[in-house]
């Protein structure tokens, strides 16, 4: 560890102790090295002892800086790991970072694009439109067509800072995992590694550009979601150029109402967008918090969502989608047996899981929830309770489902802020049932045939030759197998004879030794020993023969 890293580690420990984070672990569970280290830092006193544990954790993350703030934001979505009071506090973390100077942004853009800013853009504004811990956004116009754009640029020299903090976070996670056995349920090493992958992905803006292009293509012509156009010819690893949009932040409800927005339809559109992404496209925006969603000023009676910042996306394979849709339908029909069976069939829980016990555990957790009217039930919290129950039965971590549950909580929370009477189940059920019908009905079979038709048309001329070759190889393999079986039987017979001869030889040896001790039977003893030697010699030859 370098002196600079050691200084940073001391700073982290100081902040954690001043916020009393060490007291969150009961003394009886604290390992002796931890207690000793705490006593050795006796001059560090807790600053705000009256605050709740969630507030103290939030303040610690805020004091540790932007990388830890983003980590806290990520943790706030892992409600399968954290108590609700801590998760709610961490959700209040704001990525407030002073902008870096516009001249530095200009130099970074020119370094990435390999030419002066004025060559490509007009009206480049060095005053940032927005600033965050990883990047900041400037505005301008494309020189070739005059279109308004935003230019997102990664902060200069941010990578070494992130790498250093990540190394320290990994060190702390390993120490916690080693010395605090009760932390196993929180899986600190795994959580930090997940965060590491997420934040390193955010440093590559070409990935975000590709995600935005995919999402825009999926919703071309849609009246539910609009994704700004990306100008790929001007995008690089540290620079993203895309269309500038104008809209009302989705969380600004007074502005939406003043614009005459149909709030009920807007809330339902959010649900439609989410389930369309998941079940039609298998590709969903996984960071749909209010800061990334706007509503178009145009057509307030037919509101259009606008999505930005596609740095984090999720994907589902066909099997995940099928099991997920069946799970939704099963637990809203209170068919807990089917929910348990689906978890086993999907491989989300081990195959030796006792379905009866799993069903009982699910029923115990979900049945009280479903005593409420469906319109009052939180879809996201049902999923959360289901995953927490499954985790007790050794459910493997499913990153795609964690992202899905986080996004669903965002969408549901937004929907009910916009229209408190939103019945998420009634809005979502048609999408689920329609998707299931398309996957398992006659239409699905016909679509599968059509999808595979070109492949079989290409392979059809080769079919007779393939059949002949298969039959020839089968006949050859049968002859080879028969020969191997005959050789095996011969070998087994020889081995049996060898064991028999060795056994007889051992018996004759014992008899011979006994007779040699009797003076009147020495000749018979010699004959027995000779017989034993002969039997062993024959047995040895039999055993060596193949």
From Swiss-Prot:
It is an enzyme of class 2 (transferase). One of its GO terms (cellular component) is plasma membrane. It is found in: Cell inner membrane. GO terms for molecular function: ATP binding; protein kinase activity. The chain crosses the membrane at residues 496-516, 521-541. It holds the Pfam family ABC1. Its main location: membrane. This is Probable protein kinase UbiB. It comes from Aeromonas salmonicida (strain A449). The lineage of its organism: Bacteria, Pseudomonadati, Pseudomonadota, Gammaproteobacteria, Aeromonadales. The gene is ubiB.
């Amino acid at each position: 560890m370098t002196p600079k890293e050691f200084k940073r580690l001391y700073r982290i420990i100081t902040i954690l102790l001043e916020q009393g984070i060490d007291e969150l672990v009961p003394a009886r569970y604290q390992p002796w090295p931890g207690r000793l280290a705490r006593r050795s830092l006796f001059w560090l006193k807790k600053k705000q002892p009256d605050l709740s544990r969630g507030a103290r954790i939030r303040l610690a993350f805020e004091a540790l800086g932007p990388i830890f703030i983003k980590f806290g934001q990520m943790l706030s979505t892992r409600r399968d790991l954290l108590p609700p009071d801590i998760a709610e506090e961490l959700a209040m973390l704001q990525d407030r970072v002073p902008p870096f100077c516009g001249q530095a942004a200009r130099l970074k853009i020119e370094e990435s694009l390999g030419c002066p800013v004025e060559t490509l853009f007009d009206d480049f504004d060095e005053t940032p439109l927005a600033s965050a811990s990883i990047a900041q956004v400037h505005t301008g116009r494309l020189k070739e067509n005059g279109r308004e754009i935003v230019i997102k640029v990664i902060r200069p020299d941010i990578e070494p800072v992130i790498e250093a903090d990540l190394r320290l976070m990994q060190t702390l996670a390993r120490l916690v995992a080693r010395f605090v056995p009760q932390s196993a349920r929180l899986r600190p090493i795994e959580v930090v590694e997940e965060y590491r992958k997420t934040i390193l992905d955010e440093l590559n803006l070409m990935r975000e550009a590709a995600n935005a292009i995919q999402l825009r293509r999926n919703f071309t012509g849609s009246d539910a979601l609009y994704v700004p156009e990306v100008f790929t010819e001007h995008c690089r690893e540290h620079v993203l150029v895309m269309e500038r949009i104008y809209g009302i932040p989705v969380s600004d409800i007074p502005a939406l109402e003043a614009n005459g927005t149909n709030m009920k339809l807007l809330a339902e559109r959010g649900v439609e967008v989410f389930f369309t992404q998941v079940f039609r496209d298998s590709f969903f925006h996984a960071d749909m918090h209010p800061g990334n969603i706007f509503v178009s000023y145009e057509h307030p009676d037919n509101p259009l969502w606008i999505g930005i910042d596609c740095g984090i996306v999720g994907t589902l394979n066909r099997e995940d989608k099928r099991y997920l849709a069946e799970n939704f339908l099963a637990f809203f029909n209170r068919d807990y047996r089917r929910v348990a069976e689906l978890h086993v069939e999907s491989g989300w829980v081990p195959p030796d899981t006792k379905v009866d016990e799993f069903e009982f555990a699910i029923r115990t957790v979900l049945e009280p929830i479903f005593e409420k009217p469906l319109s009052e039930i939180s879809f996201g919290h049902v999923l959360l309770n289901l995953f927490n129950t499954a985790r007790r039965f050794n459910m493997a971590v499913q990153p795609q489902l964690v992202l899905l549950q986080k996004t669903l909580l965002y969408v549901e929370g937004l929907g009910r802020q916009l229209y408190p009477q939103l019945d998420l189940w009634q809005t979502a059920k048609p999408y689920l049932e329609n998707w299931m019908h398309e996957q398992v009905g006659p239409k699905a079979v016909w679509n599968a045939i059509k999808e595979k038709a070109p492949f079989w048309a290409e392979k059809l001329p080769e079919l007779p030759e393939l059949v002949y070759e298969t039959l020839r190889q089968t006949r050859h393999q049968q002859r080879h197998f028969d020969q191997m079986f005959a050789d095996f039987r011969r070998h087994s017979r020889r081995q049996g004879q060898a064991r028999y001869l060795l056994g007889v030889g051992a018996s004759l040896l014992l008899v011979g030794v006994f007779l040699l001790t009797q003076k009147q039977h020495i000749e018979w003893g010699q004959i027995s020993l000779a017989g034993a030697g002969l039997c062993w010699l024959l047995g040895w030859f039999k055993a060596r023969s193949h």
